[in-house]
Regions:
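Extracytoplasmic gate region of multi-pass secondary transporters
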Residues: 25-26, 202-245, 252-255
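Helix-breaking motifs and short loop linkers at transmembrane-helix boundaries and internal kinks
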Residues: 37, 69, 90-95, 288-289
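Conserved MFS/SLC helix-loop-helix module at the cytosolic interface between two early adjacent transmembrane helices
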Residues: 56-92
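Helix-to-loop junctions at the C-terminal end of transmembrane segments
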Residues: 57-69, 254-266, 350
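Cytoplasmic helix-loop-helix junction between adjacent transmembrane helices
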Residues: 100-137
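Helix-loop-helix hairpin linking two adjacent transmembrane segments in secondary transporters
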Residues: 131-183
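C-terminal transmembrane helical hairpin of 12-TM major facilitator-type secondary transporters
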Residues: 268-312
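A late C-terminal transmembrane helix in Major Facilitator Superfamily
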Residues: 319-355, 362
């Protein structure tokens, strides 16, 4: 049991570390630009290297974890992240920063796959779903902790990368914990046996497609909602931008509450419920004429979608007997792709059909996901009846 807890702690730290790098970048764009006398837009584009690296990492994890071994990958990735964080602190040029962020994104993407693989290997049934949702809560907690460190560092005229260096220290600690931990419960280090066990069916495929569509809808909202609210209600952009703050504030609380709910509810029912709620709330957001409703609706949306990511992983792997790292990586690749390509897809749509139609598409996407979840659950029920006969 002690080893189980240590492995689970490593999986939580993986999410904590990735969030440490991803959630505070917006606060560092201007200080970073000032440090290297660079254009703000050029610096802001570095964030795409983190996201692109994470997507590449999840794709690489699909092939590497079972071949290299989960323990070796964990040690290598978090050692590399710690070294990259140090390179950001001593970076003599913006190129080194860009290289460091790419390495962090890539290794962090692999790390998220490792985290999911650990949980689905070590825990089963309802506790597995609960642990996966706790990972989302860990991500959101880091989204509060590290920006506070950034705020303290910047207000005290410290180096812009102090907060990233602190995340690097956590990565280094994770590497040492991994070195001292037995990973045999995660399937050992041999990949050949696990590779043959990777199971694929409509349920797990729908988990990946559903997460892609869910992230597409969510990040379309986060990208365009402030401009939509500004234009629709003719208010200042700064005021309209509060909708994003309200979303993330509710997401932190929602992730913690979701942990309790999932421990008492089937993951299929939980996911179907939160997607249905998201569909209804976004329908009201895009059609309401009452500005005073928006804050409450956005809080509800953030609360409902707080555990979306790992809930889809838990949902997908519930359709296979023995989930492997490839199953987890597939769903993570789908989610990363949805988040990464959402701005590009929605931008093209906005230029062709207009902002109003783009916002109307959000609840429609959720409706498609709901339909797909219902179909996959019915297929599973039919298969269980046939097996029983």
């Amino acid at each position: 049991m002690k080893n189980k807890i240590t492995l689970t702690a490593i999986s939580f730290l993986a999410n904590f570390i990735m969030a440490g790098f991803a959630t505070q970048f917006g606060m560092l764009v201007e200080p970073l630009a000032n440090t290297f006398d660079a254009n703000v837009n050029e610096v802001a584009s570095i964030f795409s290297l983190l996201n692109g690296g994470a997507l590449a990492g999840t794709i690489a994890a699909f092939f590497l974890i079972e071949k290299v071994g989960i323990k070796r990958m964990t040690v290598l990735c978090y050692g590399a992240i710690a070294a990259a964080a140090l390179s950001l602190y001593v970076a003599p040029s913006l190129f080194i920063v860009m290289l460091g962020m790419t390495v962090i994104g890539f290794c962090g993407g692999v790390g998220l796959c490792i985290a999911g693989t650990i949980v689905v290997s070590v825990w089963k049934d309802k506790i597995q779903s609960t642990m996966l949702v706790v990972q989302d809560a860990t991500f959101n907690i880091a989204g509060v902790v590290f920006p506070l460190i950034t705020t303290y560092a910047l207000t005290n005229a410290m180096n812009w990368s102090i907060s990233y260096l602190s995340v690097g220290v956590v990565a280094l600690a994770t590497m040492f914990v991994a070195l001292l931990t037995n990973f045999n419960q995660c399937g050992g280090e041999s990949g050949s046996e696990q590779e043959a066990k990777s199971e694929w069916n409509f349920g797990i495929i729908s988990g990946g497609v559903g997460l892609f569509l869910g992230m597409l809808a969510l990040y379309t909202f986060l990208t365009w909602a402030p401009m939509f609210v500004k234009e629709k209600f003719d208010i200042p952009f700064e005021q309209a931008g509060n909708i994003i703050t309200q979303y993330w504030s509710a997401a932190l609380v929602g992730a913690l509450v979701s942990t309790v709910i999932v421990s008492r509810m089937k993951i299929q029912t939980f996911l179907l419920t939160i997607i249905s709620v998201a569909m209804v709330i976004t329908s009201v957001i895009v059609t309401t004429e009452k500005l005073e409703w928006l804050s409450y609706l956005t809080y509800g949306y953030g609360f409902a979608c707080a555990a979306l990511y790992n809930a889809f992983i838990a949902y997908g792997v519930s359709f296979v007997r023995n989930a492997t790292s490839k199953n987890v990586s597939y769903i993570l690749i789908s989610g990363s792709a949805g988040a990464m390509f959402s701005p590009a897809i929605s931008s093209v749509m906005e230029s062709v059909v207009g902002l109003q139609t783009v916002m109307y598409a959000i609840p429609v996407i959720y409706a498609v996901v709901v339909a797909m979840l219902v179909v996959s659950m019915k297929i599973k029920t039919v298969e269980q009846i046939q097996t029983a006969e």
